[in-house]
């Protein structure tokens, strides 16, 4: 809204056993309402879709993160994690740009704390956090800045029509009919 003022917005989420507050900074508007900074994807862009876990492992220290459910790490197994991360993408930006790529699109990189099959990113458990196994929020911001310095674009893929079984909206839905449920597996 035009009357919005810069400052911290507090988003309050009701959960079993209490409330969770998330502080979200609202910054001053960019000149031209962002049109001088952000450029949308057009038909002239060459988009490269990358499944980050399968691309390049630039930081082996985040391959297995203590406390996360999926500790698999085996490049020989199709459904295990392979260790690719955002640092691996950053390390290969010259190569990617050399291919003529103008925009990067990743399969979802938000936290996907499921017990297995987390390599694809489509069972998000936290829409507010970049998965630590990819390098986390700060590294995602660094990648975004580096792409923009190169005149490249970043497409953020977020899935909102389904969530992982450990997402707070699955564990503590705001209403009983919030998520469709069937007595048996349905395909």
Map each language-model feature to its residues.
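Substrate-binding/active-site clefts of carbohydrate-active enzymes
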Residues: 45, 53-187
């Amino acid at each position: 809204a035009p009357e919005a003022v810069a400052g911290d917005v507090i988003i309050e989420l009701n959960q079993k056993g209490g409330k969770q507050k998330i502080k979200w900074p609202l910054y001053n508007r960019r000149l031209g309402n962002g049109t001088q900074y952000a450029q949308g994807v057009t038909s002239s862009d060459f988009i490269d879709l990358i499944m980050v876990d399968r691309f390049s492992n630039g930081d082996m220290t985040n391959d297995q993160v203590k406390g996360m459910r999926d500790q698999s790490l085996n490049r020989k197994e199709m459904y295990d994690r392979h260790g690719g991360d955002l640092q691996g993408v950053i390390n290969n930006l010259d190569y990617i740009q050399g291919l003529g790529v103008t925009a990067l699109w990743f399969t979802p990189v938000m936290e996907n704390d499921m017990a297995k099959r987390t390599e694809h990113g489509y069972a998000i458990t936290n829409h507010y956090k970049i998965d630590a196994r990819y390098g986390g929020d700060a590294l995602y911001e660094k990648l975004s800045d580096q792409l923009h310095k190169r005149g490249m674009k970043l497409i953020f893929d977020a899935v909102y029509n389904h969530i992982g079984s450990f997402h707070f909206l699955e564990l503590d839905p705001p209403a009983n009919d919030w998520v469709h449920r069937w007595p048996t597996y349905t395909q």
